[in-house]
Amino acid sequence: MKLILREDVENLGKGGDLVDVKPGYGRNYLLPRGLAVSANPKNVKELEHQKAVAAAKAAKLKASAQAVAKRLSETPVTLKRKVGEQDKLYGSVTALDVAEALAARGVQLDRRSIVLDEPIKTLGEFEVPVKLHSEVAGKVKVTVEAEAE
């Protein structure tokens, strides 16, 4: 019996997969629970259409992420912080600080997409990785300078 899964089913497949199951399993478990629909020509055609729409949407998201990555590489960020002895910062520079500085330059990013293993605590230039999409990552150049007293 051929069915199209509506949701992920453990040990069988993911939502949208066309699967071949034993008739009893399909009739008595998958269909009554709404986990699958029969694979008639109409449903198969609708599935193909949904997959095409999803693929187009994914391609559009990836393209916009690549555009943001390009823009990030062209947008250096300079942050001024108070420093103590031996150029140690009072406090630190966090992902939120970088996100706010980028927002001031017109690049809106969620702070969780900025990958800082640990906050920046010294002066200097840093390449900070940014996770924009599952397949696209960018880098932003962050310069931490001493604030004029």
Curated annotation (Swiss-Prot):
GO terms for biological process: translation. Transmembrane segments: none annotated. Signal peptide: none annotated. InterPro entries: Ribosomal_bL9 (IPR000244), Ribosomal_bL9/RNase_H1_N (IPR009027), Ribosomal_bL9_bac/chp (IPR020594), Ribosomal_bL9_C (IPR020069), Ribosomal_bL9_C_sf (IPR036791), Ribosomal_bL9_N (IPR020070), Ribosomal_bL9_N_sf (IPR036935). GO terms for cellular component: ribonucleoprotein complex; ribosome. GO terms for molecular function: rRNA binding; structural constituent of ribosome. Keywords: Ribonucleoprotein, Ribosomal protein, RNA-binding, rRNA-binding. Belongs to the bacterial ribosomal protein bL9 family. PANTHER family: 50S RIBOSOMAL PROTEIN L9. Binds to the 23S rRNA. NCBIfam families: L9. This is Large ribosomal subunit protein bL9.
